[in-house]
Amino acid sequence: MQRKRTILIIADGTRPDVLGELIATGELPAIAQAFPERSMRRPAVSVFPSTTGPAFLPFLTGMYPGDLNMPGIRWFDRRAWADRNGDPPFRSYVGIESYRMNADFRRDVPTLFDILPRSASIFSSVNRGVPFRGNMTGLSRALWWLFAHWTDRWDVVGVRARKRLLASLEMDPEFVFCLIPDVDNYSHLSHCRSERAIAAYRRLDQTIGELFRELERRRWREDTLVVMVADHGHSAVHTHLGLPEWMAGRGFKPFYYPRIWNRAFDSAVMVSGNGMAHIHLRRGSTWTPERVPDEEVVRDFSALLEALLERREIGIIATKRGDGAVVVRSRSGTGVVTPLGEGHFQYSTRGGDPFGYGGLEGVWNADDLLEETLATRYPDGPVQLEQLFHSPRTGDIVVSAEVGFDLRDKHENPEHFSGHGALHADHMVVPWFSTVPLPDVPLRTVDVFPTILHWMGKPIPPGVTGRDRLASSLEPEHAVMTGAQSAEASAF
């Protein structure tokens, strides 16, 4: 028996229902052959915010973005701003600042690249621990992204990822991380079911086919775990709400990208995806390092809260109380998520359930909450909002857009006709395909990390949130790939 390997393919922005439909109609033959059993094709819940970058971290660390202090693809650090020392206390990973991601999340947390040093990384913005030779797209990633941004030729980048993936096998690696970006970007540019997006799914199928043929040629197939996952889903966007401009229209002076040279600001709006946003609020005339708790937001910014809830573009808003509980508001009601420790939560509602669950009040562990909410509009909503507020960079108010809307308008070039980042199922439910069968239980993307370590025979580091889901034998399968619409939408 040869030593084991793992190849982790991030099929960026792929939807499980679209994959299921294309497999059922015979349009993805290589993927169907590579993952032939239902136990090899599972739904999983991603993390909030459901956006590239922060949503890579669960795969590579087994932890949530909030626990790693990377709460969005754009963030503002009010604690660092109050101190005014060191690096600028804000980021946008849409561009050259993506090269700062490795230094921006917790330094004490090992990545798969650290644990499996014979590694290769292809087009990943998170690659801390990968050896120099294994960073196969290093500086060239920015050039390829710039080329595709101005030409819309993401197909060329997808093919380049395929070539680099196959070339990485020459290194005899134990772990390969490969991002395939074209489904996501063609979805943004058109629609998640447009002809260009579907063509990108077919190119993904070609990549899987060539990879498996090469594994067979090298006689590595039986000892290689191939995992194909998505970091987020996608849904059509018909209306944009420019949240920073909307805040300015209400009398605020917001700091936001790309207008980062403004220093006379009383708020900050950091949009991710573009389906979610952090809103930071200044107390009085000076910025203080502590987050503004829910009690003060209600007292001093009640008009803002009410105005946000009146907007049809906004589905959920959340704040954090001084006692650590997260308050969730929507037009349907108010909920409180109280962490009790050891992965347990108390959930209560007032005036209706903001998530629309109904009947979920009480004390739950995280796994049971996931199981109870998996088929709802907001799968894993309480757990995901609570983890996000672990980060001191998380806003005083967290906003999740409604389906069909996003939160960035005039400064998004090119315009997004499909998006992600929000808390609803369209963006949170993703495919997890594995050549080793997975158990018939609710899954999260944080589970990928410990499952890979199990396959590789490595111990799981302390503090990991995810669960090892590797199973050698399974009961008959009943799960289906849930799409963003309903469990019945899938062709799996």
What are these regions, as identified by a protein language model?
Residues 3-19, 34, 59, 116, ...:
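Beta-strand elements within well-structured catalytic alpha/beta cores of enzymes
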Residues 261-275, 288-301, 437-470:
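A short beta-strand-to-alpha-helix junction
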Residues 390-449, 457:
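Low-complexity, glycine/alanine/valine/leucine- and proline-rich hydrophobic stretches
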Residues 317-330, 458-483, 490-492:
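Polar, surface-exposed loop/tail segments
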Residues 26, 42-45, 49-51, 73-101, ...:
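Secreted, luminal/periplasmic, and some membrane-associated catalytic domains
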Residues 1-40, 50, 464:
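Active-site-proximal N-terminal segment of extracellular/periplasmic enzymes that hydrolyze or transfer
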Residues 55-203, 327-375, 394, 404-408:
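His/Asp/Glu-rich, glycine-adjacent segments
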Residues 22-26, 136-138, 191-197, 240-247, ...:
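Short secondary-structure boundary/capping segments
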